[in-house]
């Protein structure tokens, strides 16, 4: 892992990867890659490599690599992605995808909420408003409500959220 990481972080990383491929070392190590974009983040570099073997990453490195790969599969950075994955991972994936960093920062700053705790209604309040017991349906409803707020289809205001829930209750129950 350390030796490959040194190659990935080198200014001559493309040459290093070509040599690994040329001498069939990629096959031996269970690595493959095609198009490759340099990033200043090692997880971003590793996320672009397909790995057939278990490489000893830390838990955080593994999580970030998987998140970056998920975003790369989607081929875009949206408000939903920024909310779900956060700014850091989205910036790395955006760099690989060729998306302007300033656009990602601007989109992130314009998010009405950044975490579940920012929603003006708690899970308990949602249950009380709808007069239902906590359940998977209510959790899904909360998730849907968060998406509506993120995409500015409803404002993150307690009264408006309550109205929205009551108006759309029949969708879920």
Model-derived features: positions:
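Catalytic core of bacterial c-di-GMP phosphodiesterases, primarily the EAL and HD-GYP domains
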Residues: 13
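Divalent-cation-assisted or electrostatically stabilized phosphate/pyrophosphate-binding catalytic cores
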Residues: 2
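Amphipathic alpha-helical "coupling" segments that flank catalytic cores
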Residues: 6-9, 54
